[in-house]
Amino acid sequence: MRLASSQGATLLAAELAPADYAEVESRDLLSPYAAGVYWLTLGEQRMALLISAPSSTPWIEQSSAADLTIRFPATPSGCASSLARWQFFDQNFTLLHSQTVNRDQHPAPPIAPSQARWRSLSVIQSEYQGTIRVEQMQRLTIPID
């Protein structure tokens, strides 16, 4: 699998075992990819993906150590609603627990597992381009006191 910019620069590459489903994540980025056309190559198949401009409004804001605000992005026509998810990690960033946030409630974190050292809140927006699901995510990860 290879994802390349319109100029041909490799942005993401991975060896995938033959399967009906595969998932590949980019490294955490300090800045998002630019909007535009990208090329995804899966085996002998090459397809264009249109990546939209990232939101100029943060989806997650922290006003104090305990107070977080979620601004769910608008849902494009024909797409699933965005979702938010709490995750807890140990000191090695091994996932300990994950829980989806109810969109109608304040995003207060659930009780952290005793060995948790980090908590993370993510807002994820998904869209399909053919059979390919493209996710854009904003994440805030903070230490647990």
What do the PLM-derived regions correspond to, one by one?
Residues 51-74, 142-145:
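Low-complexity, Pro/Ser/Thr- and charge-rich linker/hinge segments at domain boundaries
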Residues 20-22, 31-33, 63-65, 79, ...:
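Surface-exposed coil/turn segments at beta-strand junctions on protein surfaces, enriched
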Residues 10-28, 102-110:
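Aromatic sugar-binding surface patches on proteins
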Residues 13-14, 45-55, 127-145:
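Edge beta-strands of extracellular beta-sandwich domains
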Residues 24-33, 48-52:
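Beta-sandwich interaction modules
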Residues 91-119:
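Long, low-complexity serine/threonine/glycine- and acidic-rich segments characteristic of extracellular
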Residues 1-11, 80-98:
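Extended low-complexity, serine/threonine- and proline-enriched intrinsically disordered segments
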Residues 34-44, 114-138:
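Short, aromatic- and glycine-rich surface loops/edge beta-strands on solvent-exposed regions
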